[in-house]
Amino acid sequence: MSKDISIRNGANLNLKGGASKEFGVAKKSLTYALNPDDFFSLNPRMLVKEGDKVSHGQPVFYDKNHEDVKIVSPVSGIIKEIVRGDKRKILYVIIQKEGDDIIKFDIPSISKLSKDKIIELLIDSGSLAYIKQRPYNIIAKTNKLPKSIFV
């Protein structure tokens, strides 16, 4: 006969060792990479070339099939390398951090914004690429209204 073990409110296991309770400061990297494969079904087209200077928030590439989906630079710096694979597929874009140029967007009060202005801000800021459409977890389309929104 088997014994059933029921645990309520978790279990406290007294084990030797454990993680240290010290918090350190993370080192800031000098190189950053954008990987188009992080965005499902995105077919990238480059907007910059190697050696170009980019600002934080400047579009680096966009989706060939949906030109309103832009992927922006996470830092300001210089495009160090565009790594390509078979058939010239873009594998990743390496950005070397240099300077602190930031593209700022004028965002008025949320109550004064129209639906079209909100969509335009999402497109220009590159935030649209991170809004997913169910059931296939693809990037949301701006021309289709969602039935519901999950946060």
Where are these regions (language model features)?
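Short hydrophobic beta/alpha edge segments that flank linear recognition/processing sites
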Residues: 54-68, 91-99
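Mobile cofactor-carrier "swinging-arm" domains
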Residues: 1-15, 80, 85-87, 91-102
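N-terminal, Lys/Arg-enriched amphipathic/low-complexity engagement segments
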Residues: 1-47, 62
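Acidic, glycine-anchored pre-beta loop/turn
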Residues: 48-54, 83-86
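Buried, small/hydrophobic-residue-enriched core segments of structured protein domains
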Residues: 85-151
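Generic structural motif
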Residues: 38-42, 54-57, 66-81
